[in-house]
Regions:
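Active-site neighborhoods and metal-handling regions in enzymes and metal-associated proteins
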Residues: 1-154
Length: 154
């Protein structure tokens, strides 16, 4: 809109249906995506959002027996959860230590990449920081496995 960028990702199953294992991994990533959106508000830093994301992803992978310790999350999650959006897709230098302010737009992009199972899942939304928290600008795009499978079945 008016020259500003967006950065949105969804992971769709090529067959139209997620396998049980793909759903399991997808749901972990979705929990991280939702946790970041819930936590994003003025004063919170990108570092805090990234730490939260890694915690949720590690808890999920530990619960399904994929990792034994949160220290292993780097094997399957090797990027940050957020960056600023603006006139460029990756707007301005990443300053993980600056508190967010109302009016900023950031990405929310957790992902898990499990090479040995040939599974890669990323869910990316754009968040507008508001005085009260944030507004998910990409809310209308199907996000859950059920919504995506229904869309693909049309």
């Amino acid at each position: 809109v008016e020259g500003y960028c967006a950065d949105i990702t969804r992971t769709y199953p090529i067959s139209g249906k997620y396998s049980p294992r793909q759903k399991e991994i997808y749901d972990i990533v979705l929990r991280a995506n939702r946790a970041v959106a819930e936590a994003a508000r003025p004063g919170v830093t990108l570092r805090e959002l990234n730490d939260l994301c890694k915690k949720v992803l590690a808890e999920g992978l530990t619960a399904i027996g994929k990792i034994q310790s949160a220290d292993e999350i780097g094997r399957y999650y090797m990027h940050g959860v957020s960056h600023h959006l603006g006139l460029d897709t990756h707007d301005c230098a990443v300053r993980e230590d600056l508190g967010l302010r109302a009016g900023m737009v950031i990405s929310d992009e957790p992902g898990l990449y499990i090479d040995e199972e040939e599974i890669g899942i990323r869910i990316e939304d754009d968040l507008l920081i508001t005085d009260e928290g944030c507004r998910v600008l990409s809310e209308a795009i199907p996000r859950t496995t059920e919504e995506i499978e229904a869309l693909m079945a049309r």
